[in-house]
């Protein structure tokens, strides 16, 4: 570590693997002073000119705008765009933009009024009096994105490096052939470059600041050295010319000796890098309150009679600039935005200049040479030797052609900087960078689809969970409503129960006597006897239950069978007794309602039926007791006792049937004539007495 630090102190530089040395072709434009492009008749400002989503519009068609007025809202990583001049917004419509696909994007069309009037400006003479967040917000609202070609929002990048940045690198390499925008900017505005560096030092507080510049820019090196006189903490490093030494990872390796890990950025090792053009834009935004509305664009190529570098407003059509440089159309026409290795052919010359447009190359037909057809890969390995990122271009090519997305991703496809070195050395003329770009786009599309599917799944699961929660809550409310009664509901229930209780008490205790008739106690006596019979029946049931419990303790199965038979007989007789009692009560009630004499007859019949029911119950009880005693003495005696009990029970049933017939006959006779009723009652009493003697001869 000490040796590494000592080497840095002595201006030591390192080298990176790979790289190529193509013809530089820079003298066509680097020796010509910069010119200011006049305003065109129409400016076309795309809403998205950076890496990230487009901003929300703040203007409408037909509205007058001033120079530097925001056209969109900038939030987060959304960088706003501004009006390059004053004028009227004639349309907000899609237009072809500077992209290899040639797709149309939403743009604001402004017709300049020629006055070029600024909005109200608030310069900051001393930026050191402002806190870091105010400076970051100023840079963000100025719409500054990386002017080196990536277009990453500068404020977001700086905010991520507020803590932990050791080395600040200013990228002045500009390694790609033909491009000289940064070269001329450093030659003519070196003081602004140094001022912008001081603003970044105030923000990031790095331990050291390094400016990396290739040795093929002697005028720019001299201008920076003059601007750095008397400046401490800023070191100029001149590096050998090699493509692509201007790459972020490659220049980091050259100046610090550190390698950025795969899948990481230079900030992961404490390094933050900014382009020279971005530094000048930061100075103008912070101190002069000028948003990013213009940039330096290199116009070069043999198809131009007067190449050079121009200060061009954002939104200026490419064809307008080409005419300023003396464009001579070729057949077939070819205009490249960017350099010959990393640029792309424009689908139309009507596309506008954007924030990342650093060069417009218009080559002659003989300058670029004839395009040769693509041939099969011969596995020579030259692409591997030329790759500055340490990748395997040959394998990535096969993965891209075979649509093996995961393998391409695992082989660090996204670490490819698309420098074009592999395609430059390929003897088979395979456009490797095009395959890589297409594969990256497909992987990003698949990732976006997967993300949308995951979001849809999450929304569906959240909805299902919400419905389940609502269902449980609804069921709980229903249960609570069914169980918990309000005070009003409880009062209603109590009132209903009270009414039923009063009705029940009144039906049992009140006896209605028709008008004009004398009360007769015979029905009351009969009802009393019936209640006594019911009580005796309940007593019999209790005795039956006790007998059943006793018989469960008997070990012999035959004894258990006999006990069960006796229990069934007792239950049957108890039910018959209850039935007889009910009939007696009903008969008594009817008799009272019709005639006192009939009531007397009905009462007599009821008394007879009650007496017979009691005798039948007594017989059943005796039979059960006898059966129990016999069962306890001997199984054979138990069987005999059970047979005798069945016979007695049968006779009791016959006697009850006879009694019922007598009662019915008496009722019919009573209905015809009182004297016949008396005779029938006497006959019934005689028959009942005989039946009782037959049941119990003792």
UniProtKB/Swiss-Prot annotation:
<comment type="function">
    <text>Part of a membrane-bound complex that couples electron transfer with translocation of ions across the membrane.</text>
</comment>
<dbReference type="GO" id="GO:0009055">
    <property type="term" value="F:electron transfer activity"/>
</dbReference>
<dbReference type="GO" id="GO:0051539">
    <property type="term" value="F:4 iron, 4 sulfur cluster binding"/>
</dbReference>
<keyword id="KW-0813">Transport</keyword>
<feature type="binding site">
    <location>
        <position position="387"/>
    </location>
    <ligand>
        <name>[4Fe-4S] cluster 2</name>
    </ligand>
</feature>
<feature type="binding site">
    <location>
        <position position="426"/>
    </location>
    <ligand>
        <name>[4Fe-4S] cluster 1</name>
    </ligand>
</feature>
<dbReference type="InterPro" id="IPR010208">
    <property type="entry name" value="Ion_transpt_RnfC/RsxC"/>
</dbReference>
<feature type="binding site">
    <location>
        <position position="380"/>
    </location>
    <ligand>
        <name>[4Fe-4S] cluster 1</name>
    </ligand>
</feature>
<keyword id="KW-0004">4Fe-4S</keyword>
<keyword id="KW-0249">Electron transport</keyword>
<dbReference type="GO" id="GO:0046872">
    <property type="term" value="F:metal ion binding"/>
</dbReference>
<dbReference type="GO" id="GO:0022900">
    <property type="term" value="P:electron transport chain"/>
</dbReference>
<keyword id="KW-0479">Metal-binding</keyword>
<feature type="binding site">
    <location>
        <position position="383"/>
    </location>
    <ligand>
        <name>[4Fe-4S] cluster 1</name>
    </ligand>
</feature>
<keyword id="KW-0472">Membrane</keyword>
<dbReference type="InterPro" id="IPR011538">
    <property type="entry name" value="Nuo51_FMN-bd"/>
</dbReference>
<keyword id="KW-0997">Cell inner membrane</keyword>
<feature type="binding site">
    <location>
        <position position="377"/>
    </location>
    <ligand>
        <name>[4Fe-4S] cluster 1</name>
    </ligand>
</feature>
<dbReference type="GO" id="GO:0005886">
    <property type="term" value="C:plasma membrane"/>
</dbReference>
<comment type="similarity">
    <text>Belongs to the 4Fe4S bacterial-type ferredoxin family. RnfC subfamily.</text>
</comment>
<feature type="binding site">
    <location>
        <position position="419"/>
    </location>
    <ligand>
        <name>[4Fe-4S] cluster 2</name>
    </ligand>
</feature>
<feature type="binding site">
    <location>
        <position position="422"/>
    </location>
    <ligand>
        <name>[4Fe-4S] cluster 2</name>
    </ligand>
</feature>
<dbReference type="Pfam" id="PF10531">
    <property type="entry name" value="SLBB"/>
</dbReference>
<dbReference type="Pfam" id="PF01512">
    <property type="entry name" value="Complex1_51K"/>
</dbReference>
<feature type="domain" description="4Fe-4S ferredoxin-type 2">
    <location>
        <begin position="407"/>
        <end position="436"/>
    </location>
</feature>
<keyword id="KW-1003">Cell membrane</keyword>
<keyword id="KW-0408">Iron</keyword>
<comment type="subunit">
    <text>The complex is composed of six subunits: RnfA, RnfB, RnfC, RnfD, RnfE and RnfG.</text>
</comment>
<dbReference type="InterPro" id="IPR017896">
    <property type="entry name" value="4Fe4S_Fe-S-bd"/>
</dbReference>
<dbReference type="InterPro" id="IPR019554">
    <property type="entry name" value="Soluble_ligand-bd"/>
</dbReference>
<keyword id="KW-1278">Translocase</keyword>
<dbReference type="InterPro" id="IPR026902">
    <property type="entry name" value="RnfC_N"/>
</dbReference>
<dbReference type="InterPro" id="IPR037225">
    <property type="entry name" value="Nuo51_FMN-bd_sf"/>
</dbReference>
<feature type="binding site">
    <location>
        <position position="416"/>
    </location>
    <ligand>
        <name>[4Fe-4S] cluster 2</name>
    </ligand>
</feature>
<dbReference type="Pfam" id="PF13375">
    <property type="entry name" value="RnfC_N"/>
</dbReference>
<dbReference type="Pfam" id="PF12838">
    <property type="entry name" value="Fer4_7"/>
</dbReference>
<dbReference type="InterPro" id="IPR017900">
    <property type="entry name" value="4Fe4S_Fe_S_CS"/>
</dbReference>
<feature type="domain" description="4Fe-4S ferredoxin-type 1">
    <location>
        <begin position="366"/>
        <end position="397"/>
    </location>
</feature>
<keyword id="KW-0411">Iron-sulfur</keyword>
<keyword id="KW-0677">Repeat</keyword>
<protein>
    <recommendedName>
        <fullName>Ion-translocating oxidoreductase complex subunit C</fullName>
        <ecNumber>7.-.-.-</ecNumber>
    </recommendedName>
</protein>
């Amino acid at each position: 570590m000490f040796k590494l630090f000592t080497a840095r102190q002595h201006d030591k530089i390192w080298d990176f693997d790979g790289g190529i040395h193509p013809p530089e072709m820079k003298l066509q434009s680097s020796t010509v002073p910069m010119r200011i492009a006049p305003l065109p008749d129409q400016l076309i400002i795309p809403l998205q000119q950076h890496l990230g989503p487009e901003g929300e519009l703040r203007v409408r068609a037909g509205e007058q705008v001033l120079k530097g007025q925001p056209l969109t809202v900038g939030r987060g990583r959304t960088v706003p765009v501004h009006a390059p001049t004053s004028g009227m917004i004639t349309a907000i419509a899609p237009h072809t933009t500077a992209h290899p696909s040639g797709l149309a994007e939403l743009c604001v069309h402004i017709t300049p009024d020629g006055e070029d009037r600024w909005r109200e400006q608030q310069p900051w003479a001393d930026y050191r009096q402002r806190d870091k967040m105010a400076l970051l917000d100023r840079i963000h609202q100025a719409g500054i994105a990386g002017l080196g070609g990536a277009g990453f929002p500068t404020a977001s990048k700086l905010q991520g490096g507020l803590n932990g940045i050791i080395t600040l690198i200013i990228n002045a390499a500009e390694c790609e052939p033909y491009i000289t925008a940064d070269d001329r900017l450093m030659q003519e505005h070196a003081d602004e470059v140094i001022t912008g560096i001081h603003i970044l030092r105030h923000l990031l507080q790095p331990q050291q600041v390094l400016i990396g510049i290739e040795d093929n820019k002697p005028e720019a090196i001299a201008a920076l050295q003059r601007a750095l006189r008397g400046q401490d903490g800023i070191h100029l490093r001149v590096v050998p010319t090699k493509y692509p030494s201007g790459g972020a990872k490659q220049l980091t390796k050259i100046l610090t000796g550190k390698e950025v890990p795969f899948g990481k950025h230079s900030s992961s090792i404490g390094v933050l890098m900014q382009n020279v053009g971005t530094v000048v834009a930061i100075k103008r935004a912070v101190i002069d309150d000028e948003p990013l509305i213009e940039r330096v664009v290199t116009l070069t190529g043999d198809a131009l009679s007067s190449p050079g570098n121009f200060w061009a407003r954002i939104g200026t059509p490419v064809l307008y600039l080409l005419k300023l440089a003396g464009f001579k159309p070729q057949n077939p026409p070819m205009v490249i935005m960017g350099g010959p290795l990393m640029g792309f052919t424009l689908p139309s010359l009507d596309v506008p200049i954007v924030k990342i447009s650093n060069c417009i190359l218009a080559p002659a037909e003989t300058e670029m040479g004839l395009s040769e057809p693509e041939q099969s890969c011969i596995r020579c390995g030259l692409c591997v030797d030329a790759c500055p990122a340490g990748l395997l271009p040959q394998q990535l090519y096969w993965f891209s052609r075979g649509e093996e997305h995961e393998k391409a991703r695992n082989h660090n496809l996204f670490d490819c900087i698309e420098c074009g070195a592999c395609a430059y050395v390929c003897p088979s003329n395979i456009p490797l960078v095009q395959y890589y770009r297409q594969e990256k786009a497909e992987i990003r599309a698949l990732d976006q689809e997967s993300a949308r599917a995951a979001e849809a799944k999450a929304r569906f699961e959240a909805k299902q969970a919400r419905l389940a929660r609502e269902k449980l809550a609804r069921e709980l409310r229903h249960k609570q409503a069914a169980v918990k009664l309000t005070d009003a509901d409880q009062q209603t229930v109590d009132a209903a129960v009270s009414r039923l209780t009063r009705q029940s008490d009144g039906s049992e205790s009140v006896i209605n006597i028709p008008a004009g008739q004398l009360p007769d106690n015979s029905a009351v006596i009969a009802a009393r006897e019936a209640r006594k019979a019911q009580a005796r029946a309940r007593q019999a049931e209790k005795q039956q239950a006790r007998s059943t419990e006793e018989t469960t303790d008997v070990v012999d199965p035959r004894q258990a069978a006999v006990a069960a038979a006796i229990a069934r007989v007792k239950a049957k007789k108890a039910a018959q007794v209850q039935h007889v009692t009910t009939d007696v009560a009903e008969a008594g009630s009817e008799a009272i309602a019709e005639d006192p004499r009939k009531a007397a007859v009905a009462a007599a019949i009821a008394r007879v039926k009650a007496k017979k029911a009691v005798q039948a119950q007594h017989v059943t009880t005796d039979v059960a007791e006898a059966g129990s005693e016999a069962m306890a003495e001997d199984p054979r005696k138990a069987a005999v006792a059970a047979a005798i009990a069945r016979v007695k029970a049968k006779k009791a049933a016959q006697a009850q049937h006879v009694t019922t017939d007598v009662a019915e006959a008496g009722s019919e006779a009573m209905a015809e004539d009182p004297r016949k009723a008396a005779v029938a009652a006497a006959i019934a009493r005689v028959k009942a007495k005989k039946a009782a003697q037959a049941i119990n001869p003792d």
